[in-house]
């Protein structure tokens, strides 16, 4: 009978306990509101809200309304946002090796990308986690191609044009200097205006990105030569994520990881359709005119990779690991 008052007290406490306050994760992205990226993210957010019984909710700010990557990171630091879908260039200030797959002309095709990513994605995600970022996946934008207002199919042509690189991206600067090109840095949000005003004449961008960001409206030519692999990351401030209970964390990781994998699959399926769409818009496809011109691009890629490694943009150790995977994959084909 002595235990009865304790049992009654426990029941009363349970009855009047205040439920855990919902955690709303405010996420910024440059992706347009009507993009497949946003559709999949919203579907994932709805599933998470249901499975966590409202304890975890997402609110998205698409279309760059929160500013460029630098502005978004500042807002995360000031707790105005809890996370973002960011280009890997924006995350290099925390972990430089996150741009490993950006090394120019490292991959010949998507099968090679998949072989290396299967081995090293966990390493890159762990590196960001150590710097305070929870990563739900690395989302593929695809191979970037040079698109320009004036025709250009050789490195010499590119060196005469005003070529864009992302602002405050040391890795991109080292890479393009390896090709012997002097770039014009701009934020992604300013690229369309830069093309319209002739501040820049050429960009390197995946076809799906050129369509989504409307850059295709200001270019006339595409060099059909994949220059680098482009991807981003869906990240959340680890301090915020750690406030969720373990079960809710597992749900968020599962759902958003799955959705981001689907984004990569959709972007890859859309790759051919995007090329066709660019052609239908009147963009002319170019190719290196001869073997010597192609060899010059390949050598430029090698020099650009070396420059990125020498500058510390990517560690030699991780590059060698990626290269070992590539060589093993190629030898097995």
Predicted ranges, named:
Residues 114-126:
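Signature of the catalytic double-stranded beta-helix
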Residues 6-16:
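Bacterial N-terminal signal peptides
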Residues 23-112, 128-333:
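N-terminal secretory/targeting leader peptides
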Residues 16-22:
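Sec/Tat signal peptide C-region and signal peptidase I cleavage site
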Residues 1-5:
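Positively charged n-region of N-terminal signal peptides that target proteins for export
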